[in-house]
């Protein structure tokens, strides 16, 4: 049997972390078994579904490289198929027309609730022989079995059973002729030959209804697996304040897709004590029986730790392709300065996100208008004039511009003046970067370049002279 899974989001908003994890688990299961992964857009909610949301979902999937083998399919383009199946069910007696008014249904609901009963349709039209005009408004209901129970072996939670007496005859076609969500899902899974349905636990109550419809259609019933919800680290339902933002927001905030995927796969699944997984390892090791039944806690600090790891572990040339977007957002012209891959090597240890990296690299490519006030006050003082002049001349004398030779020039300056490295290094750092912090000074000066570094040292010396004149 060929394994076939699907990810079926409703395009009423962005792709959030919960949806992304469900997509990842479905994708991994299919890939682990050499199967196929289908993308289906469940857009039957015409009022809330938007083209922007569809684009956002597909952007998120593409950024995470969760490529699909079929689709995207759109439910709104399959209404003829759904209605044909409903008409077939009406002929076979597994569905029936219901003419009950909204007023009657509301009164029935209030009566049942007053008695402490679960609100459900009482089946009045199921056995009715009343004659109705062809154009009289009606819905179509599924004739749910009235005896027995529905049992399915959830691959994460184990056997789950529902009594058919708890399930009423759900509406499968509205008065306007449009099919309902639960019915469309069934026909889609049937037509697309889905073998395994991996989805959130909020769909558990839909499962017995969908199984009963499949059985009425004499269609194969897929295997179900319901993934637990994601909470914040405070144990409460995940919300925006916990980080429940769109997948693309993580891109915008400077996270690598590898970091988010690694974090999401571990958010409810484990393989021994292993924390870091390549995409190939995820595919190799992923199984549904290793997915936890318990809710997971989203921890932004852990995600940030993973992102920092991947910034330094992945090839700099690859990280640079993602950094490029953030550089563009900062409007930095990188034509005159180090290659982005070299920048990744320079700033990788200091920066935990690509956004942070982009925001802290401008001095490598563009001259700064002024020095950081605190750093200049502390380090660009008259006592720094001589160390800066000496190191400038030694840097100017370098014929082979390497980080090693830059280091020798700084060290030689300290030795010649008989001062500690800090007496040379700190004024030099402020002079060439404009700030009091940077990566290792020798590689920083090397990356900034010989001509630009000397020009900036001269600018710092002029700043010191002007400061002296003002005193």
Swiss-Prot record:
Keyword Ribosomal protein: no
Entry cofactors: Zn(2+)
Annotated catalysed reactions: tRNA(Glu) + L-glutamate + ATP = L-glutamyl-tRNA(Glu) + AMP + diphosphate
Residues reported to bind ATP: 240
Keyword set includes tRNA-binding: no
Motif range ('KMSKS' region): 237-241
Superkingdom as given in the UniProt entry: Bacteria
Cofactor note: Binds 1 zinc ion per subunit.
Motif range ('HIGH' region): 9-19
GO biological process, one term: glutamyl-tRNA aminoacylation
Annotated Zn(2+) binding sites: 98, 100, 125, 127
EC code: 6.1.1.17
Gene Ontology CC: cytosol
InterPro entries: aa-tRNA-synth_I_cd-bd, aa-tRNA-synth_I_codon-bd_sub2, aa-tRNA-synth_I_CS, aa_tRNA-synth_I_cd-bd_sf, Glu-tRNA-ligase_bac/mito, Glu/Gln-tRNA-synth, Glu/Gln-tRNA-synth_Ib_cat-dom, GluQ/Sye
Record key words, sorted: Aminoacyl-tRNA synthetase, ATP-binding, Cytoplasm, Ligase, Metal-binding, Nucleotide-binding, Protein biosynthesis, Zinc
Sequence similarity: Belongs to the class-I aminoacyl-tRNA synthetase family. Glutamate--tRNA ligase type 1 subfamily.
Summary of subunit composition and partner proteins: Monomer.
HAMAP family found in the cross-reference section: Glu_tRNA_synth_type1
Record function comment: Catalyzes the attachment of glutamate to tRNA(Glu) in a two-step reaction: glutamate is first activated by ATP to form Glu-AMP and then transferred to the acceptor end of tRNA(Glu).
Name this protein carries in UniProt: Glutamate--tRNA ligase
């Amino acid at each position: 049997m060929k394994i076939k899974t699907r990810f079926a989001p409703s395009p009423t908003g962005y792709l959030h972390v919960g949806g992304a994890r469900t997509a990842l688990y479905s994708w991994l299961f299919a890939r682990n078994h050499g199967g196929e992964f289908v993308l289906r857009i469940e857009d039957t909610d015409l009022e809330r579904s938007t083209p922007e949301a569809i684009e956002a979902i597909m952007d998120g999937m593409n950024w995470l490289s969760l490529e699909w083998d079929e689709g995207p399919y759109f439910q709104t383009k399959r209404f003829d198929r759904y209605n044909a199946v409903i008409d077939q069910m009406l002929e076979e007696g597994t569905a029936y027309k219901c003419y009950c008014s909204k007023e009657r249904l509301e009164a029935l609901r209030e009566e049942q609730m007053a008695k402490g009963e679960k609100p459900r349709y009482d089946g009045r039209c199921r056995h009715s022989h009343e004659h109705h005009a062809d154009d009289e408004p009606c819905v179509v209901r599924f004739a749910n079995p009235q005896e027995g129970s529905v049992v399915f072996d959830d691959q994460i939670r184990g056997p789950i059973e529902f009594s058919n007496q708890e399930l009423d005859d759900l509406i499968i076609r509205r008065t306007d002729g449009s099919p309902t969500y639960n019915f469309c899902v069934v026909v889609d899974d049937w037509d697309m030959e889905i073998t395994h349905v991996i989805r959130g636990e909020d769909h558990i109550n839909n499962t017995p209804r969908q199984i009963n419809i499949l059985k009425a259609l004499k269609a194969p019933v897929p295997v179900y697996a319901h993934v637990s919800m994601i909470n914040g680290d405070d144990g409460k339902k995940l919300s925006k304040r916990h980080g429940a933002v769109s997948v693309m927001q993580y891109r915008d905030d400077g996270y690598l897709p590898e970091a988010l995927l690694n974090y999401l796969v571990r958010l409810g699944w484990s393989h021994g004590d292993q924390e870091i997984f390549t995409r190939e390892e995820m595919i190799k090791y992923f199984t549904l029986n290793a997915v936890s039944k318990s809710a997971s806690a989203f921890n932004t600090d852990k995600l940030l730790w993973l992102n920092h790891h991947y910034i330094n572990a992945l090839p700099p040339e690859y990280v640079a392709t993602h950094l490029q977007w953030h550089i563009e957002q900062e409007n930095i012209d990188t034509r005159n300065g180090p290659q982005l891959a070299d920048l990744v090597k320079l700033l990788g240890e200091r920066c935990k996100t690509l956004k942070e990296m982009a925001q802290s690299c401008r001095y490598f490519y563009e001259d700064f208008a002024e020095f950081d006030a605190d750093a200049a006050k502390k380090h660009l003082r008259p006592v720094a004039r001589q160390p800066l002049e000496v190191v400038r001349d030694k840097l100017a004398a370098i014929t082979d511009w390497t980080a090693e030779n830059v280091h020798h020039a700084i060290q030689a300056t300290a030795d010649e003046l008989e001062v500690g490295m800090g007496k040379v290094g700190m004024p030099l750092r402020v002079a060439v970067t404009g700030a009091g912090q940077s990566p290792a000074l020798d590689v920083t000066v090397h990356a900034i370049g010989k001509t630009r570094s000397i020009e900036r040292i001269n600018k710092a010396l002029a700043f010191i002279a002007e400061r002296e004149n003002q005193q």
